[in-house]
Amino acid sequence: GIGNADRNSSGKTVTRRNDEETDRINFTTAEQIHTGWDHAANAYYAGELGKWNIDFNADYLFKRSHSDQNAMNNDDATVQADSRMRSSLYAAKLVVSAPLWNGRFSFGTEETFTNRHDIFTQNGFSADADDHIKQSVYAAFADYSRSIRHWKLNMGIRYEHQQTDYYEKGIRIDAQSPTYNDIIPVLAASWSHNGKSFSLSYRLRKNNPDYSLLTNSIRYRSKYEYSQGNPLLKTQKTHRFSAGA
């Protein structure tokens, strides 16, 4: 999609010491957001080859935006900032499945490639930023599920290679460009009989920080308040055990 949006805010900040007012700031912020053309494309295939089911899906996304920010404190123009962002994503997933030993076996691959470039310039209240993040994820996985009388069993494993390349003003920053090689297991069992049931499961989850949290761009909120990402944030891994009845 394409379009523009305007955001305007105003307020005041009062500073007190020992119950006496020491500073008062009336502020007004105006922000114009310009979105360029967003592109999205999808391709998929679902079919059979003998006993094998084949499911393939691929996506492409492209987005860019541009915003101008102007802020005034006590009628003095103090902040001018310009932010530009371009991002793209390619993703593909292939899953092949078939009956096996009275259960179902599946395996496949998944690939994701992302590319985001943020450019931030300002009039002196902070530092300019030029951040470029590229990330590639390659994964292979297998899964098997089966029902045995009152039991339902599921087990799976996934190998994932994740490479991130972080650039500041065109220079790769090794300390902020991690590589992960992870084996991610999934185990689950449930039992049900005569209205009674219980379940057990274990899963390893990975959560990557959003790109907006990794940028060095500084967002002005008031004379005393700024917001900024942290490019040193790492992927979070959580071991999750659950039981229910």
Describe the predicted segments one by one.
Residues 8-24, 66-75, 117-125, 165-173, ...:
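Outer-membrane beta-barrel translocator domains and adjoining extracellular loop/strand segments
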Residues 64, 117, 161-168, 177, ...:
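Surface-exposed extracellular loop regions of Gram-negative outer-membrane beta-barrel proteins
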Residues 39, 90, 138, 181-183, ...:
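Exposed loop/turn and edge beta-strand positions of beta-sandwich/beta-sheet ligand-binding modules
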Residues 25-27, 83, 182-184, 226-230:
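Short, surface-exposed, polar/charged, turn-prone segments marking secondary-structure boundaries
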